[in-house]
Amino acid sequence: LETSDCRNLQDIRQYVIARLRRSAYTEEQLDAIADSIVEKSEGVFLYAEFICESIEAGEIDPYEPKEFPSGLYNVYEDYFQRRFPSLDQYNDEVAPLLKLIVAAREPLQLNDLIPYLSYLNKDWDEDFLARIMKQLGSLFRLDDKVIVPFHKSICDWLTRNDDSLYFISRKKGHRSMITWAKLYGHDYSLM
């Protein structure tokens, strides 16, 4: 289905209502919230999923739809602004991890990442990574000791060459991967 197809928009609406029905909203409130999310979603199901998650987490007020970000990339921007208000902390602690993630051809193993990241910053250990992963929230998840973006679009947004304060250079990520490979005797061509 095309994103603008009325069946797609109806699917998004039904999803929002079903997901938020667990909360204490009246049918009228659910309808209004769903209509607002569908309108701002630009037909992107992932947008609706993320907004519902943010509403459930108390990060977005469902009664202020004009405050909802427009489009998926704006969702990511707003999310990062809330999670990383200090750009210094983001650049020092989070960006080095994200550089590796966006440059990798395959999901990265934690036991490979931590030694390299601790080489860059002596504070990096499993507890430090757990804190960073908590801040990243649902955008990146740990699956069996592997870090996985929840959707390709998050890496696309991070690496877009625009004015985002959270921009991650894929080129610098590749340089980090090469340094990592040299330090730990990995074959970069396999990463």
Predicted segment positions?
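C-terminal leucine-rich, beta-strand-based interaction scaffolds used for sensing/assembly
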Residues: 117-183
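Short acidic, hydrophobic short linear motifs in intrinsically disordered regions
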Residues: 106-116
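Conserved nucleotide-binding/hydrolysis micro-motifs of P-loop NTPases
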Residues: 5-9, 105, 154-156
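Short helix-capping/hinge SLiMs at alpha-helix to coil transitions
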Residues: 88, 101-106
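Non-catalytic, charged helical/coil tracts that couple and regulate nucleotide-powered enzyme cores
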Residues: 1-95, 110-112, 123-126, 143, ...
